[in-house]
């Protein structure tokens, strides 16, 4: 399987965060040619786009940044509204959820993949540390894979290497890819826009740090 993939082209849905950067290095290992696509949808911090650009430049990779600012016009949410406090809604879904975001992102990634001749799309969604986002579920990804292939009349494969990994296992994968320190210091996960270990207070920082501590404990490095 790996020898086949090594001769093919892939595109990574890339935000500059821990998960998508792990997917970047996963893709570099498994595919002959890799390009990145980042979506500018009016994130809380412009820093996210700049971090993605910097990592792409560091790795010498072709990087597409697409304007998706219309998302912030469709629904108020804590990812795009700077003055909105991050909370859980009554149904348990965080108010950082942007309805249909991954549906749109994968559609545009698929269109770009078609144009550049890439059969494979890699995204860092996962169910294990699932925040309640319905468009991170494996069932949605499988459905989207079929939909994209039918819509473009061309085989398309969506890869989700982190789907069944918790955060500790994601750190383990980055260590196996020999990029744990790079991901720890260069990526942006923090909702408050602080690179690396982040603010230590927001839900994203708590999840990331807890996973790192669990992994380092498991290998006796803490």
UniProtKB/Swiss-Prot annotation:
PANTHER family: 7-CYANO-7-DEAZAGUANINE SYNTHASE (PTHR42914:SF1)
Pathway(s): Purine metabolism; 7-cyano-7-deazaguanine biosynthesis
UniProt: Zn(2+) binding residues: 190, 199, 202, 205
Described function: Catalyzes the ATP-dependent conversion of 7-carboxy-7-deazaguanine (CDG) to 7-cyano-7-deazaguanine (preQ(0)).
Cofactor(s) of this protein: Zn(2+)
Organism: Staphylococcus aureus (strain bovine RF122 / ET3-1)
Similarity comment text for this entry: Belongs to the QueC family.
Keywords on record: ATP-binding, Ligase, Metal-binding, Nucleotide-binding, Queuosine biosynthesis, Zinc
Quaternary structure note: Homodimer.
Cofactor binding notes: Binds 1 zinc ion per subunit.
Molecular function via GO: ATP binding; ligase activity, forming carbon-nitrogen bonds; zinc ion binding
Reaction(s) the record says it catalyses: 7-carboxy-7-deazaguanine + NH4(+) + ATP = 7-cyano-7-deazaguanine + ADP + phosphate + H2O + H(+)
CDD domains assigned: QueC-like
Pfam families according to UniProt: QueC (PF06508)
EC number: 6.3.4.20
Keyword Transcription regulation among UniProt keywords: no
Protein's recorded name: 7-cyano-7-deazaguanine synthase
UniProt binding sites for ATP: 14-24
Any one of the GO BP annotations: queuosine biosynthetic process
Keyword ATP-binding attributed: yes
Parts of the chain that traverse the membrane: none
InterPro entries noted in UniProt: QueC, Rossmann-like_a/b/a_fold
Domain of life of the source: Bacteria
